[in-house]
Amino acid sequence: MALYDRANSRNAYAEDSVLHESELVSFVKTTYKFFAGSLLLATVGALLGLMNFQAVVQYKWVFFIAEIVAFFGLMFSKSKPGLNLFMLFAFTSLSGVTLVPLLGMVIAKAGLGAVWQALGMTTIVFGLMSVYALKTKNDLANMGKMLFIALIVVVVCSLINLFLGSPMFQVVIAGASAILFSLYIAYDTQNIVKGMYDSPIDAAVSLYLDFLNVFISILQIIGIFSDRDK
């Protein structure tokens, strides 16, 4: 009888494992669908913004505040299906619009090709760090505290440079930010495949912010060095 009970327990455990794995695969697929949708809407937002460049530049603070409001709306609607997806796409669309002044600066200094170059580099970084997260034997969860401290340092340095206005200091900040968010890509990717997020929305916004910040950092570096070449 005891042997029979143990056999049943093993079968139940195997069934639970298969069910959990199936749910995790579905979770990951949904996450990357939302991530892809976020990138698409951010691109649409940026294109519409570039088509109305003067208006976006004139009201850039309005769009920035709207983006912040949408982000906090997303954070507060995490547990509300439907609304959280709407807020995710509202936030990502607005983040594309608020990129327009930076995109315009880079295009003016280095041409449209520089934007595609930055996007290509960001995509390569994202792909490489994602593969690393999936292949490595290391538990990247241990990086969490270090990455958060580094993020605070980068934010503080960015605020300081708002007053200093140093191009070279900005290059250092952008370089550090690119490295930091590249590491965050690996960190967040591993957390996603381990099922550490509560919902695909949470996971998708983490990946989106990682991608966006690497892209912004590369754009800033290209813009600054293009200006120095002239």
From Swiss-Prot:
Any one GO cellular component localisation term in the record: plasma membrane
CDD domains: BI-1-like_bacterial
Coiled-coil positions: none
Main location as per UniProt: membrane
Matches recorded under InterPro entries: Bax_inhibitor_1-related
Keywords: Cell membrane, Membrane, Transmembrane, Transmembrane helix
Transmembrane segments: 34-54, 56-76, 87-107, 111-131, 146-166, 167-187, 205-225
Keyword Cell membrane attributed: yes
Compartment(s) of residence: Cell membrane
Family classification: Belongs to the BI1 family.
Name of the protein in question: Uncharacterized protein jhp_0854
